[in-house]
Design a protein with these regions (language model features):
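NAD(P)+-binding Rossmann beta1-loop-alpha1 motif at the extreme N-terminus of oxidoreductases
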Residues: 1-56, 60-63, 90, 120
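Hydrophobic beta-strand scaffold residues
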Residues: 28, 48-49, 110-111, 153, ...
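Short, structured coil segments at secondary-structure junctions
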Residues: 44-45, 82, 107, 149
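Helical "substrate-binding/catalytic lid" subdomain
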Residues: 161-285
Length: 290
C-alpha cells in the first residue's frame, strides 16, 4: 500500500500535477532545483518541501523534468528506497527508459515511463492522458497515484513504450499544426473568411484538436499563450524521427515536419509557445493568420 508520494520537478506541468496528490495521500513530498518553488508549493497545497535525499525515500516517486538526461543524472546521484516505484512523466527517450528500468530493477525499484498529454489546463484539472510503459504489476500498484493526476491512465507496453507513444503523439500534433497553417494561408490568399472556414472544417472530416482549439485560441487570436514551449516540441519530434530511423521505415511527411519545427524553433523568439511555429510560415508567405 502506498504510504508516501514524492514529486520531483515543479515546472509548468509538475507544479500543477503535484497539487492533486495531497487529496489522496497523507504524505506528499516535493522537490525542485529552485527550492523556493518547492516551499511555495508546500504553502499553497499542503505538500512537504524536502531535500532530494528524503524525497527519494517515498513509496512512489514522480519526476517531470525537461529531458531524459536530466532524469538519469538525478537518479545516478541518489539512493532510492528499495521497493519504490519511479514514475517518470518527462517526455523522454525510449532507450533511456529501458536503461533506467533495467538498472533500477537490480535495486528492487520499478521504473515506469509515464509521459502525459493535456497541457497545463489538463494538469490543473487532473484530466491528463498518461501513457505508461513498463512492468504491468508495477503499473497496477502505481495506478492510484497516477489516477490522481489524470483521466485516462493507459498501459501501452514494455519499458520505453510510453515515451514512444508520447513522441509520436507530439509529432502528429506538429504535422497537424503545420498542415493547418498551410491550408488556412491558402484559404486567406483566396479571400475566404477564416472564422467561417473554421466552423465548416470543425463540422467536417478535416477537423482535429489543432482546428478545434489550438488555431482559434492561439493562432487566429494572436495570443500564443506559452503552455508548451516550442523547444520541447522540437525535442519530441526529434525523438519520434529517431524511432522511425531505428525501425528503418520511410516517413517523408514526418521527416519534413521535424525539419520545419526545428527550423521554426531556431528562428523563434525566446520562450515561445509551440503554436508560434506558424510564424515562420507566415514570414515566408507574408500572410498573417488572423
Amino acid at each position: 500500500m502506498t504510504q508516501s508520494v514524492a514529486f520531483i520537478g515543479l515546472g509548468a506541468m509538475g507544479y500543477r500535477m503535484a497539487a492533486h496528490l495531497p487529496k489522496y495521500f497523507e504524505k506528499v513530498y516535493v522537490w525542485n532545483r529552485n527550492f523556493d518553488k518547492a516551499k511555495q508549493h508546500a504553502t499553497e497545497f499542503g505538500t512537504l518541501a524536502v531535500e532530494l535525499a528524503e524525497a527519494v525515500q517515498a513509496d512512489v516517486i514522480f519526476s517531470c523534468l525537461p529531458t531524459s538526461d536530466d532524469v538519469e543524472t538525478l537518479i545516478e546521484g541518489v539512493n532510492i528506497k528499495s521497493g519504490a516505484i519511479w514514475i517518470d512523466c518527462t517526455s523522454g527517450v525510449p532507450e533511456a527508459a529501458r536503461r533506467l528500468a533495467e538498472r533500477l530493477k537490480t535495486q528492487n525499484i520499478d521504473f515506469l515511463d509515464a509521459p502525459v498529454s493535456g497541457q497545463t489546463i489538463g494538469a490543473e484539472n487532473a484530466t491528463l492522458t498518461v501513457m505508461v510503459g513498463g512492468d504491468v504489476n508495477a503499473f497496477e500498484r502505481a495506478y492510484p497515484a497516477m489516477a490522481a493526476i489524470g483521466k485516462l491512465i493507459q498501459h501501452v507496453g514494455d519499458s520505453g513504450a510510453g515515451f514512444a507513444v508520447k513522441a509520436i503523439n507530439n509529432m502528429l500534433l506538429a504535422v497537424n499544426l503545420w498542415s493547418v497553417a498551410e491550408g488556412f494561408s491558402t484559404l486567406k490568399a483566396h479571400g475566404v473568411n477564416l472564422d467561417a472556414a473554421l466552423n465548416c472544417i470543425n463540422a467536417s472530416s478535416g477537423k482535429s484538436m489543432v482546428t478545434e482549439t489550438i488555431f482559434p485560441q492561439r493562432v487566429l487570436s494572436r495570443e500564443f499563450p506559452v503552455t508548451f514551449a516550442l523547444p520541447l516540441l522540437a525535442k519530441d519530434t526529434g525523438i519520434a524521427l529517431d524511432l522511425v530511423h531505428e525501425a528503418k521505415l520511410p516517413a517523408p511527411i514526418l521527416a519534413l515536419t521535424q525539419s520545419l519545427i526545428q527550423a521554426a524553433n531556431l528562428t523563434a523568439e525566446p520562450n515561445s509557445d509551440f503554436s508560434s511555429a506558424v510564424k515562420m510560415y507566415e514570414a515566408w508567405t507574408k500572410i498573417i493568420l488572423k
